[in-house]
A protein has these predicted regions:
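N-terminal assembly/attachment segments of tailed bacteriophage virion structural proteins
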Residues: 1-154
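A signal for long, low-complexity, Ser/Thr/Asn-enriched, surface-exposed stalk/shaft
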Residues: 157-183
Length: 183
């Protein structure tokens, strides 16, 4: 079953960054996504969060799609097999955060979404054979900001489930390349 998330919420620091961008003081630079298994109460004020309650992993942002003048979809791929280390213990994905760079404070939790109770996806530990992935489309408010930048790596990894081979897909000086990785 796919996880069902409530509407994302801008944190107070995210709202402050948005105000700076609307005033022309900065560009909103989205840096990464994170997932965790923190639990929240129904009346909890998510805007006061400065971090996930129980962060388990971080992920590079893959793409952004403008929905309208105030919202964008940010896409990222969650995986239990990453260059930064394989996931050792599985977890239920109960919280997802999007981070951004504030010119005055550094990296901040910009927005947060929590899953509906008992509607969580499960990210299993990596089994040393085939990775598990979850593709996330995250609706994000950028309300009237003149410029939004997505910080993402210039390469991504692809796994062939049939052969178990790993490939790098990337962009180098405007050219797209595809290369098998031997470990």
């Amino acid at each position: 079953m796919a996880g069902i998330f409530k509407e994302s919420v801008l944190t107070k620091k995210g709202i402050a960054l948005l105000a700076k961008a609307q005033a022309g003081r900065c560009t909103i630079k989205l840096t990464k996504a994170a997932a965790g298994d923190g639990s929240y109460t129904s009346g909890e004020d998510l805007t006061t969060r400065t971090a996930l309650k129980s962060q388990k992993q971080t992920f590079p942002l893959t793409t952004t799609t403008v929905q309208n003048a105030t919202n964008v979809f940010v896409k990222f791929i969650m995986s239990n097999h990453q260059d930064s280390g394989d996931l050792k213990n599985g977890y239920y994905v109960k919280e997802i955060g999007i981070f951004a760079t504030d010119p005055d404070e550094g990296e901040i939790l910009y927005a947060l979404a929590i899953a509906e109770t008992d509607q969580w996806d499960y990210m299993p530990a990596f089994n040393d054979l085939l990775p598990s992935t979850i593709i996330i489309d995250f609706l994000l408010e950028v309300s009237n900001a003149t410029d939004v930048t997505i910080q993402m790596p210039n390469k991504q990894y692809a796994y062939d489930d049939t052969t178990g081979k790993k490939y790098i897909i990337g962009i180098d000086n405007g050219l797209i390349y595809f290369q098998e990785v031997t470990e």
